[in-house]
Amino acid sequence: DNTLTLALRQVANLSAGKVLTGGSLALAVPVLKNNGLLQVGGDLTLTGDSLDNSGDISARTLTLHHSGAQTHNAGAKLQAQLEAVLSAATLTNNGSVLADRLSLTSDTLVNGGQLQGTKQLDITTTTAGNSGKLLTDGALTVKASSLNNGGTLQGEAINLTGDSADNS
């Protein structure tokens, strides 16, 4: 098993910082700030209270679970070759999140960047605000009590479920 597991209180991977492994990585950190490169050849699991990402994170599969805020700032890149599963109380994206299959779960989603699941994009949230792009060549599913869309929704099939939607 080529898995590295780390449980730390805080990690700051600064702009010149690089974390590289050909295997898998499980990182349990209450507060993770990434401005550098986090590149994993296998599966990457990040868990904790919050993630503040301004750098590049890539892996074969990604699982990111944060009980508080998960933020992908402008210029940030999050990429999974196969599947990415992101969950947080508040998920804010102003960068680029790309996977074959992308699944997001949050209480609040604020997207000003690009969320792209090449084959599938699933979003489950209470409140969704999109001024960016939600893209897929397959099925786009958004389950939200409230959806405010001023951006782009693109998919072969689009399924919106919720109480209210504003598409202006």
Protein language model regions, located:
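Low-complexity/repetitive intrinsically disordered segments
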Residues: 1-8, 161-168
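Short, T/G/N/S-enriched strand-turn elements that build extracellular solenoid repeat scaffolds
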Residues: 14-20, 32-39, 51-58, 72-79, ...
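Residue-level signal for pocket-adjacent positions within structured domains
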Residues: 27, 46, 92, 129, ...
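Short "repeat-start/strand-capping" segments in structured domains, especially the N-termini
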Residues: 1-4, 21-25, 40-45, 58-63, ...
